[in-house]
Amino acid sequence: QAFFEDKDAFLSSISDEKVRHFAAINYGPWDRLNGDTPFLSGYEDKALGAEFYPHDMEKKEFATADFGDKQGLYSMVKRDEAGNLYSVPYSEAFKSELMKASDLLKKASELAEDESFKQYLQLRSEALLSNDYLASDMAWMDMKTNPIELVIGPIESYEDQLFGYRAAFEAYVLIKDLAWSEKLAKYAAFLPELQQGLPVAEAYKAEMPGSDADLNAYDVIYYAGHSNAGSKTIAINLPNDERVQLEKGTRRLQLKNAMRAKFDTILVPIADTLIVPEQREHITFDAFFANTMFHEVAHGLGIKNTLDGSGTVRGALKEHASALEEGKADILGLYMVQSLLEKGEITEGTLEDYYV
């Protein structure tokens, strides 16, 4: 989905060990943390649509074409022999790989001791082959007691920079931190109140997210696919399916060990350079953790469908959806932190800690 060459052949063609390692990190010849700039000679700029669409396809052609699953999350767009566009479900496009993954999930479900986790693994294994992820997303939200967490499948659409329609495959294996999760649990009860307190017109907060949403902390032990490309994700808000969000809410997963590593090795050195000395006392892990957490909480708030009923907000915003959604989450997260500080529900630190 991200690169058109065979992975093993591509990496073996790079003689310099450090460059080869950098290419493996980026899942291709483009620097993902520098605007997808090519760092190997012989490669052009990365296609905005990655491998989801034909490289020679223009937006105008796509807009006027008529074919099934045109804006599908779980399909590739191809050309037929006559040059016409058509879609191929992931379950067909990656059939051999998904059959292997599905079989492994079934075997894992037989070993699972937690019944809800067993059910999720079974449904997810079926979803990989049916291309219908709704039932398994619902089952994932129903899991509450599993100490091991698996997030797997086509999930985020950031890789599709052309339209933001299509999701890329990824996987996480996580271990739940029970002590930290208990500390975070109290915030879930405030989500309906936070939704109603949004500083916007009533029409933009009429949709009430499911009250079954939860906040949990985890240690991540494995990344693969999109979540492992370029940088490492430190927090997740899932599922992305608007139907699940409205019925079940979302789960906010805070990847504590990854967050700690980012704070110690990246954020603090940057702060020591950019932040004036008298403000550095406000650089705290608690504030960093909370800002990240409420950023993810903010993804689940607001409306998911357009006011005129024409479709989803994500579909209407197209390729701009991801950037606007991330900006919304940043600002709304700080708004919620301030509200909870004023209520006395957050007791760690000062408002300056969270803003600095």
Q: Which functions belong to the PLM regions below?
A:
Residues S87-R280, T284:
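Contiguous, non-catalytic segments that form substrate-binding/exosite surfaces or channel walls
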Residues Q1-A112, S116-Y120:
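N-terminal helix-rich structural modules
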Residues E281-A290, A321-K328, E348-V356:
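Secondary-structure capping and boundary motifs in well-ordered enzyme cores
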